[in-house]
């Protein structure tokens, strides 16, 4: 026991912190999916993802390019629809209806954000839940909530994989999710609950936030505030998952967690970049492969 304790805690009580390598884990998943795609191809099943982008938001361009690159890497097809900013909602809905009908399209992804004249909820709802590889359709979210089969939002699904593949137990743990967005916070809390954690969702109106986050065995930060989480928000030995992608005062990429401050007291932590980020695409590709067999 003493040896294990010595390994876990340094002389000054700091931890031997495990750095959770999202790049390596996402690569492992992509290689597994590559194998699955080849097996499907051998059976004559070709998987294709349709990616729709409206306008040319620079961040969206990068994400969309990487998603198509990911398809190429695992050996599935991708169709690309780059529509001008002034595309009407009706035109976009017509394209989605056409792709819903096509037997040679397995997944449909509409990159967000959309221009302000298009209603995102209406667009998401138009996607066939059987092709909703982003897991944003109300039917997909509802299915997740009541434990039925359906696509799961990629970033939170990726975080579960990061934890599992790093041998971090979730069952029975106190998990605090900071942030309540539809894309991350809400599905994250539902997934942790499905893994039998005790889950608290904290947000901008939470009182005594530090007291709440200090309870966490696993803390997931998804608030979009650069370096907000310092060591006084956490207890010793916490596992910290940082979903934030922000720029600090020097325009350097940083997360919602002040990594240098928090890292010494964690048992495990995800870096930014190279933590959660690469997992989103891996899980999107996972959903594309799953679309072949999913029944909703
Ligand atoms: N914009 C930011 N993240 C995402 C995502 O996961 N999916 C889509 N479609 N758009 C996004």
What label would you give each PLM region?
Residues 91-103:
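Short, well-structured alpha-helical segments in soluble
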Residues 16-45:
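Positively charged, low-complexity intrinsically disordered leader regions
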Residues 71-85, 199-201:
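Short beta-strand elements in bilobed, periplasmic/extracellular small-molecule ligand-binding domains
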Residues 54-68, 150-233, 239, 254-257:
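Glycine-rich phosphate/diphosphate-binding loop of Rossmann-like nucleotide-binding domains
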Residues 123, 244-294:
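Rossmann-fold NAD(P)-binding glycine/threonine-rich loop
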Residues 109-170:
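Anion-binding alpha/beta catalytic cores of soluble intermediary-metabolism enzymes, centered on
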Residues 104-115, 119-122, 216-248:
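Glycine-rich phosphate-binding loop
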């Amino acid at each position: 026991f003493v040896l294990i304790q010595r390994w876990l805690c340094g002389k000054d009580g700091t931890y031997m912190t495990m750095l959770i390598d999202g790049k390596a884990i996402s690569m492992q998943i992509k290689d597994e999916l590559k194998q699955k795609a080849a097996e499907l191809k051998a059976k004559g099943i070709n998987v294709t993802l349709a990616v729709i982008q409206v306008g040319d938001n620079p961040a969206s361009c990068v994400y969309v390019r990487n998603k198509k690159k990911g398809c190429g890497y695992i050996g599935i097809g991708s169709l690309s629809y780059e529509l001008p900013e002034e595309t009407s909602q009706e035109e976009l809905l017509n394209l989605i209806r056409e792709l819903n009908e096509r037997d040679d399209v397995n997944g449909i992804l509409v990159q967000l954000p959309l221009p302000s004249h298009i209603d995102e909820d209406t667009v998401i709802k138009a996607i066939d839940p059987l092709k909703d590889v982003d897991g944003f359709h109300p039917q997909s979210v509802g299915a997740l909530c009541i434990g039925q089969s359906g696509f799961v939002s990629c970033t939170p699904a990726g975080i579960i994989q990061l934890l599992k593949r790093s041998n971090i137990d979730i069952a029975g743990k106190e998990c605090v999710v900071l942030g309540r967005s539809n894309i991350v916070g809400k599905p994250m809390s539902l997934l942790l609950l499905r893994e039998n954690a005790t889950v608290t969702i904290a947000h901008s109106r939470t009182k005594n936030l530090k007291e709440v986050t200090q309870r966490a065995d696993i803390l997931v930060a998804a608030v979009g505030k650069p370096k907000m989480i310092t060591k006084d928000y956490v207890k010793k030995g916490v596992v910290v998952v940082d979903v934030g992608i922000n720029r600090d005062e020097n325009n350097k990429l940083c997360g919602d967690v002040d990594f240098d401050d928090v890292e010494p007291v964690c048992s495990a932590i995800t870096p930014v970049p190279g933590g959660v980020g690469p997992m989103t695409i891996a899980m999107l590709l996972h959903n594309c492969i799953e679309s072949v067999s999913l029944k909703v």
